[in-house]
């Protein structure tokens, strides 16, 4: 029997499942799993996971704290409830995201991350099994620097530029997630044209970041994310890790054939590359001059916050129904 493309990819790259759907993840046996508010919201709407929602509400309601913070406490428990279930399935790490509203507050991000790790510990999930996802703002990256120094590994997300990637690596981030598909989306909208896979701006961006990291010897893992097609996934074969949706994993599993390695550390070492300055002033200037990074970073934070707000409404409605039933 011929090798599937998914198996061929696995010879060169660690495959990660990008989903909160526990049953879907179980079927692909990935090494790791990533979640975000959008994926948790999608999973929370599935009847199969109503029990996990109830667990989170019970845990959050039982926790001491002011009434105005109840829904946020429940949200933390919801993320950890899903993450703990995922940690039972994958042998590696599970990424859990910090509230998007904290993207510009270093100390609040650190505090929330430490709280999430504590909630995981209470469920018997060790800190080394968890990556805390933090948006690639300057403040977020500073939080990552603090968290990494305290032994909490981080996944820097919403990476759309080399400046963000390098700043995260210099802060000691365990892993970064450059967003392939959203970069492509921006260029398609801006130019009004389509791109062949060899010209795909998202693929090129991840390739540039990977090459830079390997050339200068950064230990930070590059994990391509946000794919629009299986062709994009194949085009980044050899990247440290790739986090892929169940739909695209299914496509790759249903196709046979070789997937050639495209990214190679040895070739990256031989490349001619200049170092990039990423102090605060230069970081902010480079993001300011990069319309794609500016727009997509802001949009990504807004979208994650919108989905978190949708989760808040769902929880509030559930709490109201419970209160009316008791009354």
Swiss-Prot record:
Q: Which GO terms describe its molecular function?
A: transaldolase activity
Entry-linked SUPFAM superfamilies: Aldolase
Q: Name one GO cellular component term.
A: cytoplasm
| Active site annotation, chain numbering | 133 (schiff-base intermediate with substrate)
- HAMAP family to which the protein is assigned, alphabetical: Transaldolase_1
Tell me which family the UniProt entry assigns to this protein: Belongs to the transaldolase family. Type 1 subfamily.
Q: What does this protein do?
A: Transaldolase is important for the balance of metabolites in the pentose-phosphate pathway.
> Per its record, how is this protein called by name?
Transaldolase
